[in-house]
Amino acid sequence: MLILRGAPALSAFRHSKLLEQLKQKVSAVSGLYAEFAHFADVNDVLTSEEQQVLDRLLKYGPSVPVQEPSGRLFLVLPRFGTISPWSSKASDIARNCGLTKIQRIERGIAFYVEGQFSEAQAQAIADSLHDRMTQLVLGDHEQAASLFSHAQPKPLTAVDILGGGRAALEKANVELGLALAEDEIDYLITSFNGLGRNPHDIELMMFAQANSEHCRHKIFNASWDIDGQSQEKSLFGMIKNTYQMHSEGVLSAYKDNASVIVGNVAGRFFPDPETRQYGAVQEPVHILMKVETHNHPTAIAPFPGAATGSGGEIRDEGATGRGAKPKAGLTGFTVSNLQIPGFVQPWEVPYGKPERIVTALDIMIEGPLGGAAFNNEFGRPALTGYFRTFEQSITTPHGDEVRGYHKPIMLAGGMGNIREDHVQKGEITVGSKLIVLGGPAMLIGLGGGAASSMATGTSSADLDFASVQRENPEMERRCQEVIDRCWQLGDRNPISFIHDVGAGGLSNAFPELVNDGDRGGRFELRNVPNDEPGMAPLEIWSNESQERYVLAVGVEDFDRFKAICERERCPFAVVGEATAEPQLTVTDSHFGNSPVDMPLEVLLGKVPRMHRSVEREAEIGDDFDPSTLDIEESVQRVLRHPAVASKSFLITIGDRSITGLVARDQMVGPWQVPVADCAVTATSFDVNTGEAMAMGERTPLALLDAPASGRMAIGETLTNIAASCIEKLSDIKLSANWMSAAGHPGEDARLYDTVKAVGMELCPELGITIPVGKDSMSMKTRWSDEGTEKSVTSPLSLIVTGFAPVVDIRQTLTPELRMDKGITDLILIDLGRGQNRMGASILAQTHGKLGRVAPDVDDAEDLKAFFAVIQGLNSDGHILSYHDRSDGGLLVSTLEMAFAGHCGLNLHLDGVADNVSELSAILFNEELGAVIQVRQDATPLVLAQFSAAGLEDCVAVIGQPINNDEVSISFHGEPVFSGQRRLLQRQWAETSYQIQRLRDNAECADQEFDALLEEDNPGLTVKLGFDVNEDIAAPYIKTGVRPQVAVLREQGVNGQVEMAAAFDRAGFNAIDVHMSDILAGRVDLNDFKGMVACGGFSYGDVLGAGEGWAKSALFNSRARDAFQGFFERADSFTLGVCNGCQMLSNLHELIPGSEFWPHFVRNRSEQFEARVAMVQVQESASIFLQGMAGSRMPIAIAHGEGHAEFRNDDALLEADVSGTVALRFVDNHGKVTETYPANPNGSPRGIGGMTTLDGRVTIMMPHPERVFRAVQNSWRPEDWNEDAAWMRMFRNARAWVN
């Protein structure tokens, strides 16, 4: 084993933060140093050349001075017997670089902690430094040799029910955490007595997972008695009623990993499977919809819990039909009170929590990072979501109890696209190969399905922790590339059947696959790819290692499938074959036995149906009179409540421009304020149709009136999605996610009544279907606190997500008030019809109250009329701005519109209030509704349209936006409230800022927060030195000659399709080229005029961002010769964007004229930054930027490592004077800046892009390929038609080739 010291592992910011955390745990800690440690398992002595290559491979990341360490060593390594995702990628890179003597490279972190401490304190330090699920801590480097030793496989065990009877099974139930019900134990004893043998532990675990509440939805399929009355339908039956009443537009419901609805026709853009040339195929592009929850793992370990939640939902989309493509995501969180240190709010009363779960604040620091990181690395934009906190002590008929979300809601959802011919699963023929695609088995996530089905606190802490999975998004990306290549083959798609591997691992996925295909299966356990050979059969079969799919591929299609996997470097294995007989057999060649041999009907068949007999409880509530409150204090409290406050800290960490198909993200207007009502994507690059999604949830209302909370969730979804341009209300389809503390007094009846209100009443009345959903029935946390039994129970929680095809993505409305449209009015549409019900409002919550009467949807006809009028007014161009009314009420809706428009408000409440005592209720009630901005001369027409639709009593003019910073509210000329817009916006932004400050570099958070005080910020602007609508490539395109450009990607790259689309539009033939094609000699770069290295996360950024990719080219002789020859050709050009920029900067020794280039390292904020930034094009030789010098315009940013690091100040100066700086970040006034967030990565002198001395090679961190169409821009000037400013760059390349 070789031991190689690495670079320091912590930036100054992370170092001081960790040191502070350690001192809080162990006050004797006085100092800390951390560096990476690398360990290489070699089968022979390396030559000096090989050693040099290895040394260069392991030199990556920013340049930080190396120290001579002192203090006690805590060496944190991957758990022995495991292979980390880092190791598998680094080992791949080493092999690609010709280091064939290296079996494996592994990495740890050597923490040196100074101070005098006891062994108990040392243990506390060790606990703080590692994740015990995947890591261990050693005291010296030599012990790391055990990383490369392999444990012997553990044997099978049986449970002796033939001899020990029921007691033996009950004991196994507890020890294995199976969560079997009494009737299931009876069923298993009967079944195995019938088979005449004892069950193996692997069979019991498989049964427990397949039949857990998580997988089987027993409560939703149960029969019910309520108050002694038998109920006609199950919960699922009432949901299905929406489909039975209105099935039009639904292509697949209730039977696959996601639902499918009818989409628009467009030119779907992808590479031809044979020629690899990108092109558009005109066809229907149908819409997938799916929303999942991952609540239990997120409570235990928020980052991996939320990451694997997002990953699992992405796999559900990809595994729909015969393979599909995820497109855009959403994330939601509900937690208990945050109690931010130094920022605790008056309504946040400490109650405590069990040791095994983390705090609400830690969930909201780590969980969103996990969800965002997975989406970012996979390459899916996260475009909408929600965030709510709720925790309150309430009085019930059974006494006082705390209701809240110690068990959080972590929602991961999204939409995708699928070909019409692939919507339905195919046939599994007898003998079909049964394949696992993706990563290896590891001992993580064991028993997750059963664990998530228990109330938090009823299982052991070890079982809880074991049930959390760990993520590897780059592997999932490779799997998706394989699925993409398969569906792109059309009727030659080799996949006949596909499922994702989720709860229960292969023990659930393979039986489900063969059972759904009306087959049985024979499997060989040792064919499962396995990175922990010491696992027992149960562990191999049931672990929930992520990023895996199971597929059935016909024998005749197998070679085609294999070739695709090899090109994409995606692991796969044939584990079994399909049989005609419905028997499940798993053999084990190592031990020569059969761990599983049972009929599928025993596993999945006749399990007893649950029956629930429950009673309704009296509704609860308390008195709340808002008229007695001080309005100014109410405004401050409401603006700081997390459900109302800015969600910026959740949004800027998530890529919102990847795919180049995003038409509306959360950030609105020139000042990029996070207030959008819905998310909108384009169907493809050649049309203006698209897809919309929006969310609705009003969970605290359920404590007062559960059915009302369900109706309001649907109502809010509709008032949100109404901002997009949809042909008719029935085009909207809903996902319903139900969370309940089943068994808690009154909660079961509330659940039943709410499902009935939604499924049997409101949705049928609206003509809307719920074709997909999910339930989580164990939303309660119990623990003992110094002998006192405590619990926190969530309210019944329905989270609704709406999806719909969009007629015109250019007509999406936003809350940005327009000050350039003359005199305008603000009109309130109050669907509560003046009732102003305050129950469970944010204002009530900020005073520790609930109130008594909840807002509700009283008449479905009002909602239908509202939707129709808004759509009509939008189509006619009358609505300038739109925002729904929700949390915080009318006051918050109008303030958010003013924040987005950077303007003041003059509101007068004369038309909506009768007396002063009503004003607080009018400003803060959360009845359904919206505020629209219209030109004053159109106001009578607009009001008339609402009157004609029966909504005359719902509408009133409430004021005007004004062109200054003042916000004033009056009633009959008397002032009610006044304030400054920017100070109110700071209050609204402060909760987000406080969390950002704890999570990221505090200096950057301070700069962003202080920027809100700037009075004359003009926002994003455009100043071009060219005509955006001129196509300078048109003469060359007319010749019919289309030069070839290699669209280059490596494993983990995810931005190739939009890059190809930009070059295709500019008149090039874009060809898909994988690095594996170059390394194998399948592609010759001499065939191309241009090459573009695309964005993403090559090798998951292992060995540095873009560095592993670059080194696999530098140290592989075939690849090095190919790249060097290409760069030296005078007729070639190259572009590198984001990850491609990082990669090319590390190839500078091969690129003539690039000696001034920097190295790109971690952003100054220490965070992934997804923003719209202003850049100015510099005077340079870049062939891409000719005729653009001096132009200033916005561009999409999405990177974690974009900080340009030069060797020293002299090198920076040389770059400056050499004329090779191509782009600089500027502030909204046009000045070059290093200030955050205008400069999102802190690069010196605003450097954002470089070129070579002759201009043929250009690299940049921003993403022009995502914003070449006008509709792709989060904000754009109105005079942009089809093209955006960045299209000129690609056309410049086409003109240069000529």
Curated annotation (Swiss-Prot):
Keywords: ATP-binding, Cytoplasm, Glutamine amidotransferase, Ligase, Magnesium, Metal-binding, Nucleotide-binding, Purine biosynthesis. SUPFAM superfamilies: Class I glutamine amidotransferase-like, FGAM synthase PurL, linker domain, PurM C-terminal domain-like, PurM N-terminal domain-like, PurS-like. Residues 1045-1298 form the Glutamine amidotransferase type-1 domain. GO terms for cellular component: cytoplasm. Mg(2+) binds at residues 677, 716, 720, 884. It comes from the Bacteria. It is found in: Cytoplasm. Monomer. This is Phosphoribosylformylglycinamidine synthase. The lineage of its organism: Bacteria, Pseudomonadati, Pseudomonadota, Gammaproteobacteria, Pseudomonadales.
